[in-house]
Amino acid sequence: MGKVIAIANQKGGVGKTTTAINLAASLAATEHSTLLLDIDPQANCTSGVGLESEEVDASIYEVLIGEVPAAEAVVTTEMPFLDVIPSHINLVGAEIEMIDEMQREEILSSALPQVRRKYDFVVIDCPPSLGLLTLNSLTAANSVLIPVQAEYFALEGLGQLLNTIKIVRQHLNPDLEIEGVLLTMFDTRLNLSNQVAQEVRRYFGEKVFETIVQRNVRLSEAPSFGKPAILYEASSKGAQNYMALAREILEDNQEYIESHEARGDGTAGEDASAEPDAEAPEEGVTGALNEDASEAEEESTTPADDFSL
């Protein structure tokens, strides 16, 4: 099965959706079959690859509520090797519809195996929150990539995200790893960007990608044309940054990729989507998160080592 990477940060405006779109497109540009899964009700990923959520036959919403299998929601894009499962405004109410379901945090992980076999990578754009949709994404993922803007208060709230990852590991997905921390919106003209980069590297160490995504006009313009940066202007700094990130991820995952290719049908990683041995308690990880929320707020700048990353 292809590797599932969730792009997550509950803070808005950190480059999460930009990273999801352009990482997926860059992986596709290296001829690795990639599925971009938009689980954010804002559907910016969907429009960012040239799709109108109102015009698609099915979206991730229908998948989550059990109306269609995931394979029927897949839409091809203009870019070879890149497909998408679009989002829809109806997804806003999905968490309410899912709340009474048994093992509600595992709905996405149960739906994905049939499509994971067709791809080398699945990139999930999570909502800017730590609600049920994000929990489903983390439960379904092999790893999580955390974008962090190179601006003041960059580390604010990360303790809560790391605590969520820790709880998901304990209750739902023990194999969840940190793919890496990505510095975004880096402005080479500002000393502040360098200071933030040093601070992030001090807290996260080797988990910080060597690649840094710089502020770039073309990167900001591309979504309004419904294109990833690599299709909008491949020579732009933003497109080059995300190609460098894709290469870094491919290098870090070489063993996984070779295993995936060797087994042909994608049986590598099968255990990541296996059925749990026992049903989760009724409150599940959601209850554990509520209990630990105040604790996480106090630890918002806790070093990554405390979370065994």
Q: Where are the predicted features?
A:
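P-loop NTP-binding core
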Residues: 1-309
